[in-house]
């Protein structure tokens, strides 16, 4: 072979990369999106991406921007979790066998990638995302997420080299795999956020952006903003999730539910907000906090998560115990 082969097993935002997937895949995954573009100009490695998608019923292979994308069918997430991703793991392993990579780089523990990498006998590296075991310890979670946490613990123990986004995430991995060599490696922010100008709204306003479920502390946030003392502060909530309907019914007029919004709309709300609020009960390193900080927006958050490394309490925001 002329060049070493690198296989990267990760969720790709196919709708942002391929016009044929634009209406089928609306995920943003900004750190992977940025990495894909950063790798297009390198010539040292033959790069193969292995990614899962519900938008395909059979494997597809696409060559673009000096990289090869192997798109594999995802199928039912519930069935995958209950069967330890059996069929999906087989598909990934077959693809790895065809590629014969010199290095396997796995991203995340939520899908089948980390489990599929257990049997890989070459050099391998895991970039830890998810912290599912920690999430289950910190907030009520559905049965399937507890099952995912079980597969997380099983998979992580089989990796000797693991990168994490934050010291908080390193701590969570050490609880599962104390033998592993850990490196803290932050994920980047899309360049467009560095050039956003702040244009604060005339009246006080805050933004929350994320999944609407217990782990994000959204119940506490809504409870706080329904208090009369904050009736003059507008809270904009971007995102969807299991708690939205119940919490929206409890909301006062100063709480505005935006649902899912585009990247351009997110940037507009970040630009006009006085603060980003992120009351999480546990997060590896939320991208929204980094996006807020690179544009100079203060952040109010908790001490549970990797986001604390970007907030200096009392200077660039507040860290609530």
Region roles according to the model:
Residues 96, 260-261, 268-273:
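Short alpha-helical donor nucleotide-sugar binding micro-motif in glycosyltransferases
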Residues 168, 188:
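Carbohydrate-associated surface elements
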Residues 298-301, 311:
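Short hydrophobic beta-strand element within catalytic cores of glycosyltransferases
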Residues 143-162:
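Membrane-proximal helix-turn-helix segments that form the acceptor-binding/catalytic region
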Residues 7, 163, 198-216, 222-225, ...:
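Conserved donor-binding/catalytic core segment of Leloir-type glycosyltransferases
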